[in-house]
C-alpha cells in the first residue's frame, strides 16, 4: 500500500525533474481524471511511470510543419542579429519572440537580465534584436525552474496572429482504455487544468481504437463538439488526423496544442506545440532523440543517462541505491515510515556492472544534502557479489566518509558479504530491510546533529 502511495508522488517528481518540465503531461492526466473517464478510472493515467523526452517548442513546430499541420511562420534565432534578420524577413508589423527553455510558466518568468516574461510582442526588427539580447544566453526563472533557472540558448521568432477563437486539443495515452484518447475544449489559450476543475463539461474526450486508428468521422465530430464554425470544421479535423499520425509515427506519449485557433483570415492554426516522446522508443527514433538539449538537464541527470541509470533527485538526505523500480519505491517508503527522507530514486537495473555501481555512488555523493546511504539489493538476475565489488570500489575511490548501510539478499549473497567483510571498510551490513531503514535514518540524524554542532563524527563497526 505504501509503495503504491509513493508511486504517484514519484511520477509527479519524475515528470518535473527528468522529463517534461512543462505541465502538459500532468494537465492531460488531470483532464482525463476530472470527470471519471472510463468508469471513473481516469486518474490511473497519473500513475503511469514513463520516461519522456521533451523537445523545444521550435523543434515541435518543425515536426508539425513536416506533417502538414498548419502553423504560423517562424524561425529559430541563436543570436540577437539572427532575431533581427528573421523579424525583417517575416515582414509583418509585429512579431512574437518566444524564449526556448524546457520549463513551464515562461510567460510569467523573469530573466537574470531583469526582463519580465519569456514571450514578448515586438514591433520592429530593432526591438526584436533588443529583446532577444536580454533572453539569449541568460537564465530564465519560473515557478518550475526554481532558483536554478534554465538557460535560454535560442528564441523562436514568429509572425503574430490575431485569433477569433481559441481551442484546446491534445492526444495522450489512457491506461484504463489501453490506447490513445483525443481531448478537446472550446476553452483554449488558458490553463486547461483550471477548466477541467471548474467546468468539466467543457472537456470533450474521444477514445481511439489503437488497431483501427483515427477515423475522419471521429475528428469531425470532435471538431463540431469543440465549437469550430461549420466552414472550418473540415480543416480542424484534417489537422487533428495529421497530429494523430505524427503521434504514432514518432512514438509520442502526448501532443498538446494550446491554443489551436481560428485566425482572422478564417484559417485553423496550431499556435503552440508541446510533445513528449517515450524514451523506450529511442532505439528506433534516433532522429528525435538526437535533438535532445542536454543544456536543459540537471548535471546529475546527464551523468545518470550516460551511465544508463534511472535517477531522480529528491529533497531528502538519505541516498538510495536499489535494483528494480518497485523495490526502490518500497525502500523510499520504508525510510519515510521510520522518519527519514530519501534524497533520490536510483534504480541500477537488473544487469548493473561494477562501473555502474561506482557511477551510482558518484551520483549520490555529488548531492551535498546526502548524509547517509542505504543500498538495498535483491539478487535475482543481479549478482550480489557484483554489487559488493562496486560498493567496495566506490567507498575506496570516492573516500566516502558518510555512513553506508548495505542490505543484500539473493544470488551469491554469501560471496558479497565476504567481500564487504574482507574489505575492512566501515560498511554496515544488515539482512533485514526494516532494520536497515531504521539504522540509516538514525545515522542520518546523528550526522545532522554533528553538522549543526560543527563537529566531525567517526563511525566504528560494531564488535
From Swiss-Prot:
One of its GO terms (cellular component) is succinate-CoA ligase complex (ADP-forming). It catalyses: succinate + ATP + CoA = succinyl-CoA + ADP + phosphate. Its cofactor is Mg(2+). ATP binds at residues 98, 105-107. InterPro entries: ATP-grasp, ATP-grasp_succ-CoA_synth-type, ATP_grasp_subdomain_1, Succ-CoA_synthase_bsu_CS, SUCC_ACL_C, Succ_CoA_betaA_euk, Succ_CoA_ligase-like_bsu, Succinyl-CoA_synth-like. GO terms for biological process: succinate metabolic process; succinyl-CoA catabolic process; succinyl-CoA metabolic process; succinyl-CoA pathway; tricarboxylic acid cycle. The modification N6-succinyllysine is found at residue 88. The record marks 94, 162 as: Important for substrate specificity. Inhibited by itaconate. The modification Phosphothreonine is found at residue 341. It is found in: Mitochondrion. The modification Phosphoserine is found at residue 279. The modification Phosphotyrosine is found at residue 84. Substrate binds at residues 323, 380-382. It holds the Pfam family ATP-grasp_2. SUPFAM superfamilies: Glutathione synthetase ATP-binding domain-like, Succinyl-CoA synthetase domains. The modification N6-acetyllysine is found at residues 78, 88, 129, 139, 143, 216, 368. Binds 1 Mg(2+) ion per subunit. Mg(2+) binds at residues 258, 272. Residues 61-288 form the ATP-grasp domain. Residues 1-52 form a transit peptide. It is linked to Mitochondrial DNA depletion syndrome 5: A disorder due to mitochondrial dysfunction. It is characterized by infantile onset of hypotonia, neurologic deterioration, a hyperkinetic-dystonic movement disorder, external ophthalmoplegia, deafness, variable renal tubular dysfunction, and mild methylmalonic aciduria in some patients. Belongs to the succinate/malate CoA ligase beta subunit family. ATP-specific subunit beta subfamily. Heterodimer of an alpha and a beta subunit. The beta subunit determines specificity for ATP. Interacts with ALAS2. This is Succinate--CoA ligase [ADP-forming] subunit beta, mitochondrial. It comes from Homo sapiens (Human).
Amino acid at each position: 500500500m505504501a509503495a503504491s502511495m509513493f508511486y504517484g508522488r514519484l511520477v509527479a517528481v519524475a515528470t518535473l525533474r527528468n522529463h517534461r518540465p512543462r505541465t502538459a503531461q500532468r494537465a492531460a492526466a488531470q483532464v482525463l481524471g476530472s470527470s471519471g473517464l472510463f468508469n471513473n478510472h481516469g486518474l490511473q493515467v497519473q500513475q503511469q511511470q514513463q520516461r519522456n523526452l521533451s523537445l523545444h517548442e521550435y523543434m515541435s513546430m518543425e515536426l508539425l510543419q513536416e506533417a502538414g499541420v498548419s502553423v504560423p511562420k517562424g524561425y529559430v534565432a541563436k543570436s540577437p542579429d539572427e532575431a533581427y534578420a528573421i523579424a525583417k524577413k517575416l515582414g509583418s508589423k509585429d512579431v512574437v519572440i518566444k524564449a526556448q527553455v524546457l520549463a513551464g510558466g515562461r510567460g510569467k518568468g523573469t530573466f537574470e537580465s531583469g526582463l519580465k516574461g519569456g514571450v514578448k510582442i515586438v514591433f520592429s526588427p530593432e526591438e526584436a534584436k533588443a529583446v532577444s539580447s536580454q533572453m539569449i544566453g541568460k537564465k530564465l526563472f519560473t515557478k518550475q525552474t526554481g532558483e536554478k533557472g534554465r538557460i535560454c540558448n535560442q528564441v523562436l521568432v514568429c509572425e503574430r496572429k490575431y485569433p477569433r477563437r481559441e481551442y484546446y486539443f491534445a492526444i495522450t495515452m489512457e491506461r484504463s482504455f489501453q490506447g490513445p484518447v483525443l481531448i478537446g475544449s472550446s476553452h483554449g489559450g488558458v490553463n486547461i487544468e483550471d477548466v477541467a476543475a471548474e467546468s468539466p463539461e467543457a472537456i470533450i474526450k474521444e477514445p481511439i481504437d489503437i488497431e483501427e486508428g483515427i477515423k475522419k468521422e471521429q475528428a469531425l465530430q470532435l471538431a463540431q463538439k469543440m465549437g469550430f464554425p461549420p466552414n472550418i470544421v473540415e480543416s480542424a479535423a484534417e489537422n487533428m488526423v495529421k497530429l494523430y499520425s505524427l503521434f504514432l509515427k514518432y512514438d509520442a506519449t502526448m501532443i498538446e496544442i494550446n491554443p489551436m485557433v481560428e485566425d482572422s483570415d478564417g484559417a485553423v492554426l496550431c499556435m503552440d506545440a508541446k510533445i513528449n516522446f517515450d524514451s523506450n522508443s529511442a532505439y528506433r527514433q534516433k532522429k528525435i532523440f538526437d535533438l535532445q538539449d542536454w543544456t536543459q538537464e540537471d548535471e546529475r541527470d546527464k551523468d545518470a543517462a550516460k551511465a544508463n541509470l534511472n535517477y531522480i533527485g529528491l529533497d531528502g538526505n538519505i541516498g538510495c541505491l536499489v535494483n528494480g523500480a518497485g523495490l526502490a519505491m518500497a525502500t523510499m517508503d520504508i525510510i519515510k515510515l521510520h522518519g527519514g527522507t530519501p534524497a533520490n530514486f536510483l534504480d541500477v537495473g537488473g544487469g548493473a556492472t561494477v562501473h555502474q555501481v561506482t557511477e551510482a555512488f558518484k551520483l549520490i555523493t555529488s548531492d551535498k544534502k546526502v548524509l547517509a546511504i542505504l543500498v538495498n539489493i535483491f539478487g535475482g538476475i543481479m549478482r550480489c557479489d557484483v554489487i559488493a565489488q562496486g560498493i567496495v570500489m566506490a567507498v575506496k575511490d570516492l573516500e566516502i566518509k558518510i555512513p553506508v548501510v548495505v542490505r543484500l539478499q539473493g544470488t551469491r549473497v554469501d560471496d558479497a558479504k565476504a567481500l564487504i567483510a574482507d574489505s575492512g571498510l566501515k560498511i554496515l551490513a544488515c539482512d533485514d530491510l526494516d532494520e536497515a531503514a531504521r539504522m540509516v535514518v538514525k545515522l542520518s540524524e546523528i550526522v545532522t546533529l554533528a553538522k549543526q554542532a560543527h563537529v566531525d563524527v567517526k563511525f566504528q563497526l560494531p564488535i
